[in-house]
Amino acid sequence: MSYFTQEQKTQWKDNGFVHLKGFLNEALAQDIKDWTQELYEWEEAPGKWMKYFETSSDTGERLLCRVENFIDYHKGIKGFLCGEMIYGMVSELMGEQAVLFKEKINFKYPGGAGFAYHQDAPAFTSFGQKYHITMMVSVDASNEENGCLRMAHGFSEEKTLEQEPDGTVCKKLAAKLDWRPLETGPGDLVLFNSYVPHYSEANTSDRSRRAMFITYNRLSEGEKRLDYFKDKREKFPPEAERIEGKDYSSAESLYNLGNPIK
């Protein structure tokens, strides 16, 4: 049994990503919206889930940018992200058994900043793994106005591009890529490998652009999720765990690549 049509397999082969429109049924899409709101309402909790913030470009207020490391504290989300269907889909694309590497939700509220041109691989491969697949779950509708994902089309090579000093894709190279907006609806899934260049613009609308970004790796390359979050908590902790006056900028190319988090 395959989870993908031949057309979707071709899209994956040619571009390194595939867009599954309306994949989740209405009930599950609503559950994901409800769960995302629950995580938004959770208080900051040092040593548990990790909340990161940004500053609104519109009002200057503190906005929740993302939450990470939450599946151990939410049964519903864990059941979905680590269930037979999702593992089966990702494993099919990988050609072997997949395992969860890390999980996050980007909230991108009105006034939220964009994410610079980047590939995920340079940050992910630091844990001794060569290949990852990220699944974006569209919580809200996303379009150009609220900062949808923009993907480089026709990039099927598994190679790391030349980078700027901050780890983002070299601007001269980025200018040559075929960038296209990828608009989504609630319940859409987008799966992409860790070498596909992507970015997004700021949210200039009055609506949120919430999305889950769930990353998996090959089981044969090890289960590194706990190692990842342990290292991130030490080197680039959430605001609630930071030591006043300590400089965390040295870890930004690994843990804040192309991101608006300060």
From Swiss-Prot:
Q: Which Gene3D superfamilies does the UniProt entry name for this protein?
A: q2cbj1_9rhob like domain (2.60.120.620)
> Which reaction(s) does the protein catalyse, per the Swiss-Prot or TrEMBL entry?
(2-aminoethyl)phosphonate + 2-oxoglutarate + O2 = (1R)-(2-amino-1-hydroxyethyl)phosphonate + succinate + CO2
Q: Which cofactor does it need?
A: Fe(2+)
Which residues bind 2-oxoglutarate per the record? Answer: K108
EC number(s) for this protein? 1.14.11.46
Describe the family membership recorded for this protein in Swiss-Prot or TrEMBL: Belongs to the PhyH family.
Protein name listed in UniProt: 2-aminoethylphosphonate dioxygenase
